[in-house]
């Protein structure tokens, strides 16, 4: 009997957390109807700022420039697209009228596998839908493309909170109601993915708010993580580096003298342990900047100088 009561208490506590998060977030997540020359599409968006900005997925916006946002209380607002970044699958819109205050945004870097998460969105046109689950995995990678440009969205959150078409652009929140991710994809039954809220994402959002786009630097390398031999790992205090698989012809990396087979250890002294660590260094401030790349070639240490150009999607 005592065990049954204790179990009921746990379920009641779980329900209170989920309902509290839902009560806080539902008014702050809008149903979006995007208008474009190719027709209308739908999704969700989360209030981003107190002056009318909304955050959603780039694939929800598509080629549209205008949208209609409807909130849980039935109020609507026209919104225009402020900026789109297809290489992070994020977009920012601005409403033409006062909208609810934004929720608190958290940091996905503090999540752990097994943490409770709550998804709020508008799946299949059903506004204000709430599902709950746990963080199933962290550090997933989601490849994205814009024209000829490719990128990996880093540290994607995997959850078993049910996601369906229309959830895209909605909020994934922790048990305290802080938005830690933007729901982006349904990867299978019981498997959803969300773009994490972290330092890199915040930098992208800042660029979209202020510039309407995200400028990135381009080296022209195709790499894959590779383990370092124990002696090298101890010497450089890192276990992995990036093995160069391909150097794009006439690229900054080619001009610098990098070759397939090189093991890239660091850029400007910052260790490279995975593709994401390189991506984090290739934002606007790296364009045309003198960049020192440290690599191992035939067991010898090599330093080369590159001048990254601006990444384009053509």
Ranges and model annotations:
Residues 2-233, 238-240, 283, 299, ...:
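Serine-dependent protease modules
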Residues 206-213, 243, 255-259, 265-271, ...:
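PDZ-domain C-terminal substructure recognizer with occasional recognition of PDZ-binding tails
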Residues 98-102, 242-248, 272-275:
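Short, structured beta-strand/loop micro-motifs enriched in basic residues and often containing a Trp
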Residues 108, 198, 250-252, 275:
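Residues at or immediately preceding the N-termini of alpha-helices
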Residues 168-171, 227-235, 248-266, 281:
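PDZ/PDZ-like domain micro-motif
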Residues 81, 135, 244-247, 264:
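A structural signal for short, hydrophobic beta-strand segments that form beta-sheets
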């Amino acid at each position: 009997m005592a065990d049954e009561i204790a179990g009921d208490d746990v379920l009641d506590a779980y329900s209170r957390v989920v309902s509290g998060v839902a009560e806080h977030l539902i008014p702050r997540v809008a149903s979006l109807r995007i208008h474009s020359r190719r027709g209308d599409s739908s999704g969700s968006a989360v209030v981003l700022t107190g002056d009318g900005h909304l955050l959603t997925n780039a694939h929800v916006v598509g080629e549209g420039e205008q949208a209609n946002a409807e909130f849980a209380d039935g109020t609507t607002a026209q919104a225009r697209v402020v900026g789109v970044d297809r290489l992070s699958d994020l977009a920012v819109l601005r409403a033409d009228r006062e909208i609810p205050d934004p929720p608190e945004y958290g940091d996905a870097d503090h999540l752990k596998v097994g943490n409770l998460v709550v998804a709020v969105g508008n799946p299949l046109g059903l506004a204000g839908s709430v599902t709950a689950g746990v963080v199933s995995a962290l550090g997933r990678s989601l490849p994205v493309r814009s024209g000829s440009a490719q990128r990996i969205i880093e540290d994607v959150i995997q959850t078993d909170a049910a996601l369906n078409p229309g959830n895209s652009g909605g909020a994934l929140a922790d048990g305290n109601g802080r938005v830690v991710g933007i729901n982006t994809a349904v990867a299978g039954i019981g498997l959803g993915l969300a773009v994490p809220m972290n330092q890199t994402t915040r930098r992208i959002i800042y660029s979209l708010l202020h510039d309407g786009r995200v400028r990135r630097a381009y080296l022209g390398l195709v790499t894959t993580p590779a383990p370092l031999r124990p002696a090298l790992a101890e010497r450089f205090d890192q276990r992995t580096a990036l093995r160069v698989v391909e150097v794009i012809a006439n690229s900054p990396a080619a001009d610098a003298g990098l070759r397939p087979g090189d093991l890239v250890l660091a850029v400007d002294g910052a260790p490279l342990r995975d593709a994401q660590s390189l991506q984090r260094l290739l934002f606007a401030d790296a364009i045309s900047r003198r960049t020192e790349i440290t690599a191992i070639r035939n067991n010898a240490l090599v330093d080369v100088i590159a001048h990254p150009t601006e990444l384009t999607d053509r």
